[in-house]
Amino acid sequence: MNEKITPWIEGKRVLLLGFGREGQSTYHVIKQAGGYACLDIADMASPAQRPDEEARWITGPGYQKCMDDYDVVFKSPGIVLEKPIEEYRCQILSQTEVFFQCFRDQIIGITGTKGKSTVTSLLYHILKNAGMDTMILGNIGIPALDHMEEVKPDTKIVFELSCHQLEYMTVSPHIGILVNIHEEHLDHYKTMEKYVEAKQRIFRNQKKDDILICNVQCLPESAICPSTLLKAGVNEPDTELCVAEEPDGTWIHFRDKAYRIPVDEIRLLGQHNYFDIGVVYGVCSILGMDDGAFTAGLKTYEPLPHRLQYLGERDGVKYYDDSISTICDTTIQALKTLKDTDTVLIGGMDRGIDYRELIEYLSECQVRHIILMEATGKRIYQEIYKFYPEFKDRPRLILAEHLEDGVRRAMEITRPG
């Protein structure tokens, strides 16, 4: 591993910008490699315990002011730079950038507003189940540099990429998957254009022989996609990868292949998850996997928590956790999937997105009780009463003080069955 990281740090003054999970991982990797002139740390908050008395610590609101005092800065995802990256004299890197520079030809990169973790974990599980040498890294919670020494020449690296990891990337994966793009993280990016630009970095630096599988809902202009583009969609016949609802089941059509999803034998629910399965099927087909091996992996996959997760039944009422749904589309898809929903709880941190689509759906849907809570719920409640006089059956709306209050009320009013 040392020889992989050494060219980036040897003889240089190195700064870690951010000391969360990834920053701490980067610190240990660089410390082990050695050869740097200095290794310092800058973060808004002071750490509870300093791992190195030799390191200089820069903390507080002005912690970014020192960046140009260093040759190399390793930036943690999510930190907003105070000025455009081209205005810094230092070289700004990330774990993801360095790892991709070393192994990009072996990487299958996945991004999207929603669904990327499901696609990532499902693809990894199916490849692993089929006996392939496979590794899962990235935004799913596993720092990349911790595992550099485990990569072999034939290792398939399944890498989940957030918009924050992609934001300043100068290299793209051999196979890129863009699951979707919806309005989110506007508290960070301020404009939708900036958010889309970050997501599109997954393919911007691909090569001619690389592959991009992209949802037709967020297709890039051909002029900015240098690789082979495979369009994917639901009930979209003019795509290279189509997930289609047909009289005899849900089918995946990819190139010259057709595969029926065994929906009654798997734990992934809903059309949005069938699209995710279709994307994974496309990658597995590209890698030469037969349908039997794909089915074996699909049937043994355990969905990630908080994604239409069945929690159990109490007093005749079934409880589901779909708290990963932080945008309109996924909330609507969840309600469409669970057709007998009697009560839904909606609320959380307000990321500044437009909730009109969700409000219009809630007005028309048959859900008997809509419990709204926290910042998002209160905003939706206020917008309905201020801007939507046509909202149907307003007594369905219940404003709760917080999550605990919302759950208590839901248990009191939800009908068995």
Show which residues each predicted segment covers.
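Short, basic phosphate-binding NTP loop
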Residues: M1-G109, A130, K299, R307-Q309, ...
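Short internal beta-strands
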Residues: A37-M44, L212-V216, L345-I346, Q366-A375
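Short, conserved loop/helix-junction motifs that constitute active-site signature segments
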Residues: G34, S172, I202-K208, I224-C225, ...
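Nucleotide phosphate-binding/pyrophosphate-handling subdomain across enzymes
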Residues: I5-R13, G23-V29, D133, I261-R368
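Beta-strand->loop->alpha-helix junctions that form or flank phosphate-binding loops
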Residues: D43, G60-P61, L93-V98, P226-E246, ...
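Phosphate-binding loop of NTP-binding sites
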Residues: H28-K31, Q64-Y70, P77-V216, P220-T228, ...
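C-terminal helical cap/extension that packs against the catalytic core
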Residues: R50, E357-P416
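Short, charged/polar "capping" segments at the starts of alpha-helices
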Residues: A45-P51, K65-C66, I79-P84, C218-A223, ...
